[in-house]
From Swiss-Prot:
PROSITE patterns: AKH. One of its GO terms (molecular function) is adipokinetic hormone receptor binding. The gene is Akh. GO terms for biological process: carbohydrate homeostasis; G protein-coupled receptor signaling pathway; glucose homeostasis; lipid homeostasis; neuropeptide signaling pathway; positive regulation of glycogen catabolic process; positive regulation of insulin secretion; positive regulation of triglyceride catabolic process. InterPro entries: Adipokinetic_hormone_CS, AKH/RPCH_hormone. The keyword Secreted applies. It comes from Drosophila melanogaster (Fruit fly). Belongs to the AKH/HRTH/RPCH family. Residues 34-79 form a propeptide. This is Adipokinetic hormone. Residues 1-22 form the signal peptide.
Amino acid sequence: MNPKSEVLIAAVLFMLLACVQCQLTFSPDWGKRSVGGAGPGTFFETQQGNCKTSNEMLLEIFRFVQSQAQLFLDCKHRE
């Protein structure tokens, strides 16, 4: 693979990553088609009280990763 094609692939991947947005918060009704009212635009609207804020969810994910890393280190020290 020549350097020009590698740069082109990297640029395309970078552009795709810049356009991607992920959902970090999930409500108990995530994935269900019968969410909310039947009016237009209500399918994707968030319901009050079901979702945490982004900061709360990121903190929860961080704590989970931190606890899993600690468990891994504890197992590593036992060996």
